[in-house]
Amino acid sequence: SGHAIPGHFGHAAIYVGTERQLRQAGVWDAPEIRKYHDAIRKGAMFIEADNKGVHLSTAALALDADAIAHLRPKGLSPKRKRQAVTEFFRRVGMPFDYYFDLDTTACTFCTELVNMVLPEMRLPQRRVYGRRLILPDEMAAATLKGRTGFAFLRYVSANRDHWQVLGRQALAADLRAAWPAPQRPPHVATMASR
């Protein structure tokens, strides 16, 4: 989906954990997860929704990007975390939503997947061509402003030669730079300049 959605970020992936982490959380033997044990043991620790549908991915695939905003849900109880992880695995195999429409339930796109499983994160929604959707850039911008249930942890920017860990101000500047002023989504447009 990174080529279909405008802006700085074109995708969102969910880290669900390693075998050790899933065991510690008490969900390793859940039926929704058991069938993916081999894939997890081979390094699949992310779930994402892209043109292949909802599937597991390794870090090498999920993090193959020029920029990554690392966000983490805040305030989830251990029980709610277990429910969410299990629910993400339950969605594996769901087809991709090429219309990017939050109102469809038989298919999903990346940020819609996050919203389906974690509605308490309060992701910003907008209407585009009559459809409700969630832009990854607005998800990041709203998080920087404290308007979602996510905590901002770090922003990593990279090119072919090097990578660097940057902060909130750099992320805000890159989000603004990705959108011409008249076309900026509301959460990006209202971010203060450095």
Protein language model features and the residues they cover:
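Cysteine-nucleophile amide-bond enzymes
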Residues: 1-194
